[in-house]
Every structure is written in structure tokens, then in C-alpha cells.
Amino acid sequence: ETDWVITDVEPGDRRQHHYGLAVDYGSTTIVMQLVDLNSGSVIGEEKVVNCQVQYGTDILTRITYSLEDPSHAQDLRKATVETFRQLLEALTDATGINAAKCPVMIVSGNTTMIHFLLGLNAWTVFASPFAPVSSDPGFLWGEEVGMAFEGLLYIIPSASNYIGGDIVSGLLKLDIHKQDETCMFFDIGTNGELVLGNKDWMIAGAGAAGPALEGYISRYGMRAAPGAIDKVKISDGRISYTTIGNRKPVGICGSGIIDLLAQMRLNSWINMAGHLDPNASDRIVYLQDENQYAAVYATAEESETGDPLYFTQTDIDQYLDTKAAAFTMIECILDSAGVTEKQVDKCYLSGAFPAHSDLEAAITIGIFPDLPREKYQMIANTSLEGARILLTNRDRLEEMRELLENMYCVQFASVPDFLIRMQAAKFIPHTDMDRFPTIKAKVK
């Protein structure tokens, strides 16, 4: 018996032309790399918005859609396959190498997204007894999932319903399971997944953070694209900002929202509960037709549309729900391990959201704990990097299996006081200001 499989037969000596694909299969964006398997170098990289977004910007909306009709699960699968087709075509055009003929593709994604890819019932991930249809699909031929890909797909296994292959992949990149120090790994975006531990033990947990952190809330919330406000500063009552591509603003993305909220709190435009103070600035206006206050962060004269861009009280309240969920996940996993915030030696933050956001602003509003800043390390895409590690080093497959066997998973849905803790975390940064001493010293 052998674990080797012939995927293709080519004429001549093709050993110098040996390529593979690494994929970060995200709920919002999918990234694919073409990798030279001889050198390990990246030949090309492409990313596109996941075509599944037409069925919902967040995973729960897509699951609801899939349950409405038996054919809808196939709609989601076809949308995924179409996204992969776009990436294969883009890589081929950019590099001149036919990406669809690569012998292997490593796919790193969360458990729900893998169910969408395979056309499986994703509701099993969220519903008791939390038993996914498949947590370890292993190797599949591209044609088995309907892809115009001639090689084998290897889908990185999940540790649980919420701890998917993207987190397992990230652990291979960070090597937390080999470290003496206690490390926390937080991959945050539409969902939040955490792992806490070291070489002796590991505890993992996850939950839905919602699309707010990536900008998908509010009337003018948007993904990080040209025209999106990505940085905000308030000084002497005046708002300044930058936009992606230096264009006139058309909306605000996740990093801009964090800056805006942090700056409004530090300048007393909002109070601890996130309520706007109409006396704090003439930029805080009352919307008669909506019966609520809003902060104008770009005037009609400044914006691309000719209309003012504003963040309403409703927008703030929705965002605080999301940030509270993120912080409470961290709090619960620390308690599960009997570890205090001070005992965390390293905190790795992964995902597009933390990579492009200001850490100080995120701590100011209470998304992350008030740890010494040197303990934080931003890692742009551990899911993709871990997939590439597996692609170029098959010996680490066995290491990954051992890692999975030694990980204990926490179900946040089963934490009895999770919602009570969330209520305290809905404040900026928290009801217990002593947990945020550096922010307490700065708030006016």
C-alpha cells in the first residue's frame, strides 16, 4: 500500500515545473496562491470576493438560505466553485502557468465553509449536538466537487464544529503547540476563533462575531475598497481621515469604524455606553425621520456621492454588540483554562480585520484586552500560510494529526453566563474600567 497517487503523466522531464495551490477559503474573501513546489516560493497570488455573498454577507444568513429549499445548498456550492474558477483563471492569466492542471490544492477554511463547498447541510455545524456532516473530508478530486481542476484537493480537517481547518492551519504556522510560553491565537473577522495554550495543553473556542468588524454594518459601511475611509482622527473638535486610494469617501470600512468609535470616546462625543452627546460637537446631528442622533464623519461637500456620511446611534449599538461578543470569547476561554490576562505571554492576531486596524484603537473600545502592546503580534493570514506549509512539507500532516488529538474545544453556546458577560463588554471599553488601566488614564 502507498499514500502516493498519480495525478497526471506528462512527456519529458518536468521536474523543474512542479506547482501547487494554497487556498484561504474565507467567508468574505478567498485567496489563492500558486506555489513552486521545488523552491516553496510564491509565483502568484489572487483574491476575489466569495460569490456566496449574494446569498448573505454573513454565514448564518447563508445557512438560513440553504434551509429554505433543498436546491439552495447546491446554489452555495456552485457559487463557491465559480469563485475558485475565477481564481484559477486569474492565476493562469497572471503567471502563464495553467493553474487548473496543478497536481494538488490545499484548502484551508472553517467548518461551515467546507460544508458549503461540498454541498452538505451546514446547519449541523450550529445545531445541537453540533456534529458536522464531515470534519475531515481529506483528499478529493477536483471534479468530485464540480471544479474545473484536474488535481487533488486536500481539505484541512476541523478540530470541532467551530474550530475549522483555517485555525488548524494557523496553528501550524505559529507553532503554539511547540512553545513554552502561554500563547493566545485570535483569528477574527466575520467569525472569531481562539486558541489558548502551549506545548503542554491547548484549549480552543469560537463564535460568530458578525460582519460588523469588517465594515458590513451601517448605511455607509463597506469592505476595504477604493473610497473607503480607513483611518479617522479627531483633534480640537475637527475630524480628519484617509481613504483607500486617496479618493473622495463613499463609505467607511472596519478599520475606519474602530478609529471613529475610539476617537469619539476619547473626545467625549460618546459616553461609556456609546451614546452620542449632541452638545459635544456640531458634527452630531439629529435625524428627524429616524428619531436618532448621528455623527457626520464626512460632509456632503467632501463625499463622492454629494451626501453626508454619518454613523448613527443604531450603528454604534450594533457595533458594540459585535465587539462585546469578541471580548467575551477571550474572557471565557481564559477562564476555561484558569489563566489570567496577565499570564498570557503572546497574543497573535490574525485576519484581515486586525491586520489593517489600529491596535490601540481596538483596545480603546474594548475588542482586545489591555495587555502590554509588545505582547501583541499581527499576522496577516495564518490560514493561507499554514496551507502553504502543508503544501510544501507533507511530513507536517502527521504533526497536524497529533495537534488535533491534543486540543480541547469549548462551546461558547454552552457557557451559562456568556450573555451576562457580554452585557458588561458592551460598554466602551467595559463596565470594569480597572481592566483597561491605560485607557482609563486617557478617557476625558
Residue ranges and their predicted role:
Residues 62-71, 75-95, 104, 113-187, ...:
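Helical "lid/coupling" subdomains associated with nucleotide-phosphate turnover
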